[in-house]
Regions:
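Conserved short histidine dyad/triad with adjacent acidic residue
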Residues: 16, 31-45
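Ligand-binding loop in jelly-roll beta-barrel domains
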Residues: 80-104
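Short, conserved beta-strand element in jelly-roll/cupin
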Residues: 34-35, 46-61
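A short, N-terminal "cap"/entry segment at the start of jelly-roll beta-barrel domains
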Residues: 1-27, 111-113
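Short acidic-glycine-tyrosine-enriched beta hairpin
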Residues: 65-80
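Short strand-coil-strand connectors
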Residues: 26, 62-66, 89
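A cytosolic small-molecule/anion-sensing beta-strand core signal
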Residues: 55-56, 71-72, 90
């Protein structure tokens, strides 16, 4: 799979206020997500390393207690098991990259197909 077209994928409701399309490789998961204005993603952690690249909007991240507002062109790197949360200050479009594969997202896709 050398190319990904996020426009042709099935749009999934990932969490309340977060929807998008997913793609997986052997070792990674990629998500092109729309985050509704005001969406509050409560603090959590996971085994995955994550990079969140903001394509549109303003997204406030808290990673290990360090807070930063990300805007278009900015990204956040979240190490494995790091506690983090986010709040959409506007509607946002983001590209999230996770490694290893998000098996919970794979299961969600199977459940909804």
């Amino acid at each position: 799979m050398p190319f990904i077209n996020f426009n042709s994928g099935r749009v999934l409701q990932i969490w309340d206020g977060i929807s998008g399309t997913l793609a997986h490789t052997e070792n990674s998961t990629f998500g092109y997500f729309t985050i509704e204005n005001g969406t509050d993603l409560q603090e959590h952690s996971h085994i995955h390393e994550q990079c969140c690249h903001v394509l549109e909007g303003e997204l406030e991240f808290n990673i290990n207690g360090e807070i930063q507002v990300l805007t278009k062109g900015m990204a956040a790197f979240i190490p494995s098991m790091a506690p983090h949360s986010a709040r959409a200050l506007t509607e946002c479009k983001v590209l999230d990259c996770f490694t290893p594969v998000r098996e919970d997202f794979v299961a969600l896709e199977k459940q909804l197909s």
